[in-house]
C-alpha cells in the first residue's frame, strides 16, 4: 500500500463508503417487505414501472427495487437465499456501469439479480452474459425463479436454437446467454434480407460475468461469420516440407551484433531466427537464398511472390513458434486450439490468415481450405455498443487501467462477507525446472499423507503430464484435468476439495464452479493450492489462488518457480540471473532472496504492459473498421426498414452520371475535345443510355453541368420504363419494384462489404512496411481505409444500378449455402501483404475522418 493510500484510503474503500448509506436504506426496508404477501410483493414490479413512466429514475427507486429482490429471493418458495450487505454493494456498483470485483464464493450469480431486475423495469431488455452454455442455462433457470416470481419474463440463448426461439428469448425482460451467441446474433441480424428475420432488440444493458475473461482475454479474438473459400491447400504442404529442412540460427546479443557490424560480418547465422519474447520467426539471408532456390524464384521479396512469402512465414510460425500440447492438441484427427488462459480445448475455433492450415500441414492431418469472411466484429466493439454495461469477476484490479481506458468502466473491490482465512505463502524459487518439480512432489506428498486436498496448477498440458508421471512413480493417486480430459471437468472439480484428493489442472480449468471442502478438511488447513509456474498475467495467478478460501474457509497457496520457466527465461533481468549464479546453489536448494519476488512481479508487469499495448494498438486499427461497419450497418438498416427506396435510386443515378462525366471530361477541355466514345462505354456499362452523341450545333453551348442534367434525366426515364416493365401494369407492380430494390441493394451492400473486409484485412497485414519509409503505419492505414471505403460506396451504387436496369423477374430463386459462424484467433505477428483487386485504382489521400461519411 502506498503512502497516500495509508492516509486517505484507496479508491475502492472511498467508493464503498459512498454506497453504504444506500445499503442501509435497502436493509431498513426489509421488515416492511417481509410482511407483504407474495401477490403484494409481485405487485411492486408494476408500481415501479408506473413510477418510471411518470418521470422517476432508476436511481430514485433503486433502494426499494433492491429490497424487493432481496425479499423475493429469501422466500422459501423462491430461492431461500438472502443477499448479504456486501452483495447489495456489488449490485449497486454494477447498476452504475462499473465492475464489481468479488472474491470466489461470494455469490456473484445472486448479485446479478439486483441490477438485472432494476434495469429490466425500463422494458428495453437486459442481457446477462456468461462464458458457456451450461452457466447460461443454469443461471436462467436458477435465478429466473426470482424474476418470474416478480412478474418478469426470462429467456436463454443457447447454441443450436432456431430464429424463432432466439427471437422469443430476446423479447423477454431478461435474457441469459454467452458472449459468443450474443455477438453472432448481432452479426447475423446485419445480414438478413427481411426485417422480420432479425432476432435482437437494441443493445440496452449488459451484465458480463467473468468480465476479465470476456473483455481482456478474448479481446483479440474476433467473431467471424464465414463462407467457404476456393484456394488450393497444396502450397501449405510444400512450404511445410521446405521449412522442416531449415537450420535454426540464433539472435546475437547487443555486444555480438556491434562487433559483427564493426567487422562488417554477417550478423545472422542459420536459415532462420526465432525470437521467443516477440513470438516471431523470420528467415535469414541464407534462408531467403534457400527459399529462392527451392521454389525456383529469382527474388523472394518481389511483389509477385508476396503470397509465397505468406505461406513460408506461416509454415515457420507453425513449426517453430506453435507447440503441440501447449498451443493446440490433435483431437479426432483435427487441430484444436487450447485456450492459453483456461487450458480448455476450443473446438470450432481456428487460427486465421492461414496459420491453422499451416499447423494442419505440420501435423500431417487434413488441411482445410481457408474461408472467406462475410461479417466480423471483436468483443471490444460489440460490447461497446451497449448503452450501459457492467461486469463482475474475482480478478479485475490488475487490469483496471485497461477497463477504464478501453471500456470506460472502473473497478471497485467489494469486501468479503467473512474475513479471508487463506494463507498466501511466499514463492519458492529453484535454479532448474527439475529441482522445482521434485520440490512440488515433496510438498504434495506431505499434504496427501495427512489427508489435506491439493490442487496443482500448471501452465501447459505437457507440464501437467510431466508432474502426473512423477506422482505415479511415487504412488500418489491423483486426477488430471487438462484439454485432453475436459469431459470429466465438472466431476473432477466437484471432488477436488475432498479429503486426500490430489488434482492437477492447467491454469483455470473449472473456473465458475466453487470447490467445496469435504468433511474434516477445514481442520487440516483447507484446500492447498500449488502453482508450478507463474503465469504471464498476475490475474491468472490470482484466479488459481482464489480456488481456495471461499466464504471464509481456511486454505493456503504457494507458487514454485524455476529460473528455467518461460517467464523468467524470457523476461527476467540479467542482473537477477547473475546474482543467482553467484550464489552457487544446487538444484534442490530453494533460493530465499527477497529481490527475486520483486523480479518475478516486474517480469509479469512487463508482459502485462506489453499485452495491453498490443490490445490497445489493435483497437486503434479496429476502430477504423468499426466506424465503417457502423456506417454500413446503419445504411443497411435504413434499406431494410425503408418503405420506399426510389429516392435513393434517383440519387444514385445522379451520382453515377456526375462521377462518370467528371472522370472523362476535365474542366480545361472544350466540348469538341471530349472522348464521347470512351465516355459512352463507361456510362452504358452502368446505365444503359447507349451511344451518347452531341449534335454539332449544340456543342458551343454544351457544358459539363448541362450534360450531367441531360443524362440524369435520361437515366430516370429509363428507370421509369423498367418500373413499368416489372410492374406489368398491375396494381401490385410498384410494391414488387420496391421489394426488388430492397433485396438488390441489400445483396450488393453485403457483397461489397465482404470484399471490403477482405481488402482491409490484406492492407492491414502489409501496412507495417510503411514504417520502413518513416511514415506512421496507423495514419497511412486511416488514409487508405477512407479511400477504400469511398471506392466501395461508389461500387455499391454502380452495381445496384447495373442489376436494377437489367433485371428480369423469375419465379424460382436458387437457395444459397448458409454461412458458417467461426471464432478465430488472430495471428498478429504474421506479415501478410495486401493483394490487388482487379478494380483497384490509385487512391488519392484525403485526411477526412470516417465519421463524416454518412451516406453510401
Residue spans of the language-model regions?
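Conserved P-loop NTPase motor core
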Residues: 1-587, 633-634, 650-651, 655, ...
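Extended, charged helical/alpha-beta scaffold domains that provide interaction surfaces
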Residues: 328-336, 342-349, 551-552, 559, ...
